[in-house]
Amino acid sequence: MEISVTTSIALATIVFFLYKLATRPKSTKKQLPEASRLPIIGHTLHQMVGSLPHRVLKNLADQYGPVMHLQIGELSAIVISSADKAKEVLNTHGVLVADRPQTTVAKIMLYNSLGATFAPYGDYLKQLRQIYALELLSPKTVRSFWTIMEDELSTMVTSVKAEAGQPIVLHDKMLTYLYDTLCRATVGSVCNGRETLIMAARETSALSAAIRIEDLFPSVKILPVISGLKTRLTNLLKQLDTVLEDIIGEREKKMFSSNNQPLTEEEDMLGVLLMYKNGKGKDAKFRITNNDIKAIVWELILAGTLSSAAIVEWCMSEMIKNPRVMKKAQDEVRQVLKDKKTVSGSDLAKLEYVKMVVKESVRLHPPAPLLFPREVREDFEMDGMIIPKKSWVIINYWAVGTDPKTWHDAVKYEPERFSNSSVDFYGSHFELIPFGAGRRICPGILFGTTNVELLLASFLYHFDWKLPGGMKPEELDMNELFGAGCVRENPLCLIPSISVAGN
């Protein structure tokens, strides 16, 4: 009987890891709590296939504690499941866990892990994050985008009104708004290639599950080839790269003369980045390449579309299931806006209850239930135990956000829990860190949440909503689908009716 090439490789891999298992030296150091493991594949891998990893890991943490070690393939992972331990890791030991693992998806889709999300910790990342904070996504810059946001909101509201009385998929409407807003803010116009970029964003998200088998056995270099992941990502990158190259090349021709002198002021993010490419940035010593720019523009679009749409979709889902919350939020928006034609950025500060709705929604439905993993740069001690270099640190934020030791009625949807509370999601309150904390906190929180609040306020102001087919609120399913983030398994479909108050 013939044995296939794939089977031969699999058998050789098993023999190799059995040998490593038998010959590795025994540690005399105090060990972190861990569950019993299977040979070679280690812990939980078999449990996570086709499941929701954040829920599997929370169940294990309930048994083994908030700091838990898992051996998954070759990967040594430390899973953190409480606010106080997350604070200890990300604050006390922040520099030591400031690296990112170099995953297969990041290496290919982000031009060898360029950009702020997956770049190795060092001078490049520090400089890039400074540009994000002071130029690309500063509060002043975000305010300058309000006009763009309001313009695109008006277009979206008109589109929804045209379908009033008919079931619509809310996610599709939001994605069009977010893509067009991101493109105008990033590159100055609604660029060609919308469908390619949206398709690439969805594909990248679907392929970016927090833990992929290709990354669990890094010594088996052929694994991404056997699985087909490398081919899928390479083909996807080719399509994406064509669109990004055209956008950047066209803009650069308009910005610079033949002798490299700027012809126009930078009015958007791409303009700022091109100044740095051509040595005309605020720090003339810091230069970036076309690949840097493509990675940055792509991560801005990727992070600013799908995650924001998912947050609003969960907000609307929870309000449909909780009509009391829906009415209270609508009453606030309609009272604040009164007879205005549309929601504006300047209105958001007055929408206190809407902000509570967003906080409560990201607590229960975070855009990334497992925060992007960190990689340990040097051994360090925690709780009398050694956290080894090269381990992954995974913050199970979903476990933190539903921890009954921190939250009263932890699984109940209750925005009022944030009334008269100073807790926010900007990285200082570790019970609410859906966007991360410490040296790798998401640099685009303000931009993203501004879009989320504008979308939500527009839906609440202009429309009343109901489920199709006479479905009752309590019948709406809340099933999750796990990828780079956690979205609804079944997209939210609602029937809008035009509100007299909002029109």
From Swiss-Prot:
Q: What's its membrane topology?
A: Single-pass type II membrane protein
Q: Which UniProt keywords apply?
A: Alkaloid metabolism, Endoplasmic reticulum, Heme, Iron, Membrane, Metal-binding, Monooxygenase, Oxidoreductase, Signal-anchor, Transmembrane, Transmembrane helix
Please give the cofactor(s) recorded in the UniProt entry for this protein. heme
Q: Which domain of life is it from?
A: Eukaryota
Q: What is its EC number?
A: 1.14.19.81
Q: How is it used?
A: The strictosidine aglycone-producing AJM7-DeltaHYS yeast strain expressing pathway genes of the VOM module, RsGS, SBE (GsSBE, RsSBE1 or RsSBE2), RsPNAE, RsVS and RsVH, accumulates vomilenine. Additionnal expression of pathway genes of the AJM module, RsVR, RsDHVR, AAE (RsAAE1 or RsAAE2) and RsNNMT, leads to the production of ajmaline. Ajmaline is an anti-arrhythmic alkaloid commercially used as an efficient drug for the treatment of arrhythmic heart disorder.
| Binding positions for heme per the UniProt entry | C442
- Write down the SUPFAM superfamilies for this protein, in alphabetical order: Cytochrome P450
InterPro entries reported in the protein's UniProt record? Cyt_P450, Cyt_P450_CS, Cyt_P450_E_grp-I, Cyt_P450_sf
Q: Name one GO cellular component term.
A: endoplasmic reticulum membrane
Biological processes annotated in GO: alkaloid biosynthetic process
Tissue specificity of this protein: Highly expressed in roots. Expressed at low levels in leaves, stems and flowers.
**Residue spans crossing the bilayer:** 3-23
- Record's family? Belongs to the cytochrome P450 family.
Protein task: Monooxygenase involved in the biosynthesis of ajmaline-type monoterpenoid indole alkaloids (MIAs) natural products, important plant-derived pharmaceuticals used in the therapy of heart disorders. Converts by cyclization the strictosidine-derived geissoschizine to the sarpagan alkaloid polyneuridine aldehyde, precursor of vomilenine, an intermediate chemical in the biosynthesis of ajmaline. Converts by aromatization the tetrahydro-beta-carboline alkaloids tetrahydroalstonine and ajmalicine to the corresponding beta-carboline alkaloids alstonine and serpentine, respectively.
* Annotated protein name in UniProt: Sarpagan bridge enzyme 1
Source organism of the structure: Rauvolfia serpentina (Serpentine wood)
